[in-house]
Amino acid sequence: MAKVIQLSDELSNKIAAGEVVERPASVVKELVENAIDANSTVIEIDIEEAGLSSIRVLDNGEGMETDDCKRAFRRHATSKIKDENDLFRVRTLGFRGEALPSIASVSHLEIKTSIGEGAGTHLILQGGNIISEQKSSSRKGTEIIVTNLFFNTPARLKYMKTVHTELGNITDVVNRIALAHPEVSIRLRHQGKNLLQTNGNGDVRHVLAAIYGTAVAKKMIPLHISSLDFEVKGYIALPEITRASRNYMSSVINGRYIKNFPLVKAVHEGYHTLLPIGRHPITFIEITMDPILVDVNVHPSKLEVRLSKETELHELIRDGIKEVFQKQRLIPSAQLPKKSAPAPAKNEQQFMTFEESAPERKLPEKTPEPSYSPMKLSSVVKEPEPVIIEEEILPNEADHGVPPELGMPETAAPVSDTPEPEAVSEEIREERVPMMYPIGQMHGTYILAQNENGLYIIDQHAAQERIKYEYFREKVGQVEPEVQDMIVPLTFHYAANEALIIDQHQHELESVGVFLEAFGTNSYIVRCHPAWFPKGEEAELIEEIIQQVLDAKQIDIKKLREEAAIMMSCKGSIKANRHLRNDEIKALLDDLRRTTDPFTCPHGRPIIIHHSTYEMEKMFKRVM
């Protein structure tokens, strides 16, 4: 008796459904992507009980003729590719011909479709089998209703999460598709309640506002960079806007939402030292590339892709984000969010505006500078507007600011393919931090300073940490550092297994200034160290660098140097409760203005907080 048998189409579809239709969100994703491939401009999605009861997707796309509609429910039947060559130049969201038969095999499915000429087609399927065929209206487009999902696969139904969790997954999928296709009007409703409505005007900022709220959308700045093989556009949130999850970072390649950890890593590297540990930015990155450079035929869900020239793309995104932030003034406002009643839900997102009305600003009259200030204003700082502004924008730097309605052109100018050796000149660096006049200290920890724009509070430890970090980062990278001999050498003792690791990574340790000599069994002696090591903390610093090597699963010299620079800057910086003289404060602020990233310490904490004059007057009821 033969042991190898041919599985039936019904069983094959159920097996395929295990990968394609993982949960209700998978059904929504496949149906909406099919609607987009059909050139729909309006898509309506109605969900009942998080999709477990009913999923309805209605579009105004091209529709299908009767024969095509029947054929679409056969395995690997598709209109999107015709031969093997098409597989390597996929420009549509779907192409495998698995989604519809897989969905139909584990549900009750009803479809009405028409090409707009004559009567349409109305099919009813159960478990993948057509049980009814009728004529339908001639309205151009397609309507698909999926009910009783997983009715014949109880094991899959048993592992469904709560209604709240499944609805969250559906919302997440639709949000990302809406971001990838702002030219399509998408409405998502759950049990009659609107969860998302986009207007399909092609402006991704309006979609960002619909998903994250207008306040967050106004804090997102445009990104536009390109190279020979890639064009990258999108919006990235200012570093003050963070989340605890990476789920707010969206990547799209050729109109397809994807999950790709190297791209997420590239974005994080672009934000390097600007985000607190454990926090993540809100970003939307849209990549356009030749389809031959991306393989989307990796997994039936089509979320995972393989990229050619991934390293080049990684560097392009990382450097592009860094360059955008190097032209920004990133001083957050100290104002607290105001509690207010939630706004009534709107059925449409039409006519959304980013504008904030404000009186015309004029340059303030030049006032005499205090005699004690050694710093000069490199540019006149404008008077603040009497509106809620959480981030100051550089004058004449609108290209890298907020959406156009807030005073910037439609798109930011693309970043040059060839980065300059020094991205930010000394003049631009000093302009990014406004001129501030010290007026005192608070608790020996915070410096208070002022100018015509209001009050600035500076964390003195974080400020010096940033200054020293940039100094040590340069020093640690030196090939032959200036070495200083120690009068009393330092000795270190380790367990046998640790000594083996240390011996293996002597070269890496020397690259960060730790010069070890064998000194007996599992012991080492240090007779010299780079001259720039923080005085009095050499032993502790060397121990911590060695510990990093012992703890690391894989040694990355670049990362090791980075961690060493951060460690030295933290240890050598001013501590809390240290009262500074006026000249020390002024020197500290002067040095801070010359740093590359003067707004956060190496750990991502803010250095400067701003209280605008207007907000101060408002708090004291001098203005209403």
Curated annotation (Swiss-Prot):
Domain of life here? Bacteria
The record's GO CC annotations read: mismatch repair complex
**A Pfam family hit:** HATPase_c_3
Cysteine pairings via disulfide bonds: none
Q: Where is this region: Disordered?
A: 355-377
The record's listing under Gene3D superfamilies reads: 3.30.230.10, Histidine kinase-like ATPase, C-terminal domain, MutL, C-terminal domain, dimerisation subdomain, MutL, C-terminal domain, regulatory subdomain
**What keywords appear on the UniProt entry?**
DNA damage, DNA repair
**Which ranges are annotated Basic and acidic residues under compositional bias?**
358-368
Nuclease is among the record's keywords = no
> GO terms for molecular function, please?
ATP binding; ATP hydrolysis activity; ATP-dependent DNA damage sensor activity; mismatched DNA binding
Extract the SMART domains matched here.
DNA_mis_repair (SM01340), MutL_C (SM00853)
What is one process in the GO biological process aspect for this record?
mismatch repair
Concerning its family, UniProt says:
Belongs to the DNA mismatch repair MutL/HexB family.
State its role.
Answer: This protein is involved in the repair of mismatches in DNA. It is required for dam-dependent methyl-directed DNA mismatch repair. May act as a 'molecular matchmaker', a protein that promotes the formation of a stable complex between two or more DNA-binding proteins in an ATP-dependent manner without itself being part of a final effector complex.
Supply the name of the protein. DNA mismatch repair protein MutL
Protein's organism: Bacillus velezensis (strain DSM 23117 / BGSC 10A6 / LMG 26770 / FZB42)
